[in-house]
Amino acid sequence: MKFLDQAKVYVRSGSGGAGAVSFRREKFIEFGGPDGGNGGRGGDVWALVVDGLNTLIDYRYQQHFRAKNGGHGKGRNMTGAKGDDVVLRVPVGTQIFEEDNKTLICDLTEVGQRYCLAKGGNGGFGNLHFVTSTNRAPRRANPGLSGEERALWLRLKLIADGGIIGLPNAGKSTFLASVTTAKPKIAAYPFTTLYPHLGVARIDAREFVLADIPGLIEGAHEGVGIGDRFLGHVERCRVLLHLISIQEEDVVKAYQIIRRELETYGNNLSDKTEIVALSQVDTLPIEECKAKQEALQKSVGQPVMMFSAVSHEGLDNVLRSVAHVIEMARADMINKHQD
């Protein structure tokens, strides 16, 4: 399935039905009086979070959604039928914005959560509603109110426990494919991954979700390579696994490029717990790998791990480190809720 993390939709709720002008007509009742019913309310437009979706691709092909109008009122004080609702099914992590794509309307983070995007118009009053002591047989009724019409942006921010970040060809997709059942495209050229992939990793009976964020480059926070949208997927991650290819001539510079993008993007991305690891260590002699590891450790001020997703050397150690940070973050969240 193709991945789409942003889509514009146009929604319109149903208009209310018109009230009825009607009079009671029965045998032997000469002046039955008014009995016109009210119009039915127009249908609403809802956003609903469903399980099993991880893309907004459906909204590339259908962008206009219109709920049904309410039914007109009828005689015998019968209210018109309510218009049918329209439901936009979206994945967990969908945010909905106004047409300016900046004003947040709602953030949908749980399966089953729903939000009314456009409320149906109320039905008009029938003539029975207008009976007064001085007007026993009114001949007027109200039309229904019009529905709401809005243009909205849907934006998906994947919800993963850990985000795998790094420059293009840092080995992110190979790592994800090695530790999960995800099948991202893997090739020896930059930007193989053009959209995020999710996979479930397991280690020591612990399970967590990892997201392979497409290769970030210098200027990503400004939208270079649509990197600003990719950075948005990192916002919800509990830990960042920052991969640097051991084949980089200057591993320190490669690390700093991504760090600058995180800091410039904002939204506390640079404050997230980060695990730094050198990938593809099976491609260089061990002495050269250790020299690059020491240089990077001096620069980042924390231990730097090394692994190969092909030979699986050091892979479990990296996974255990990621799992430990995620476990601690989950425990902190539970404690906060209890407080």
UniProtKB/Swiss-Prot annotation:
Keywords per UniProt: Cytoplasm, GTP-binding, Hydrolase, Magnesium, Metal-binding, Nucleotide-binding
Every OBG-type G domain range: 160-327
Molecular functions (GO terms): GTP binding; GTPase activity; magnesium ion binding
Subcellular location field: Cytoplasm
Binding locations of GTP: 166-173, 191-195, 212-215, 279-282, 308-310
Entry GO terms, CC: cytoplasm
Cofactor: Mg(2+)
CDD domains assigned to the protein according to its UniProt record, in alphabetical order: Obg (cd01898)
GO biological process: ribosome biogenesis
Span of domain Obg: 1-159
Record-listed Mg(2+) binding positions: S173, T193
Pfam families the UniProt entry points to: GTP1_OBG (PF01018), MMR_HSR1 (PF01926)
Record EC number: 3.6.5.-
Complexes and interactors: Monomer.
Membership in a protein family: Belongs to the TRAFAC class OBG-HflX-like GTPase superfamily. OBG GTPase family.
Function: An essential GTPase which binds GTP, GDP and possibly (p)ppGpp with moderate affinity, with high nucleotide exchange rates and a fairly low GTP hydrolysis rate. Plays a role in control of the cell cycle, stress response, ribosome biogenesis and in those bacteria that undergo differentiation, in morphogenesis control.
PANTHER family noted in UniProt: DEVELOPMENTALLY REGULATED GTP-BINDING PROTEIN-RELATED, MITOCHONDRIAL RIBOSOME-ASSOCIATED GTPASE 2
NCBIfam families to which the protein is assigned, alphabetical: Obg_CgtA (TIGR02729), PRK12297.1 (NF008955), PRK12299.1 (NF008956)
Name of the protein described by the UniProt record: GTPase Obg
Organism (species): Bartonella bacilliformis (strain ATCC 35685 / KC583 / Herrer 020/F12,63)
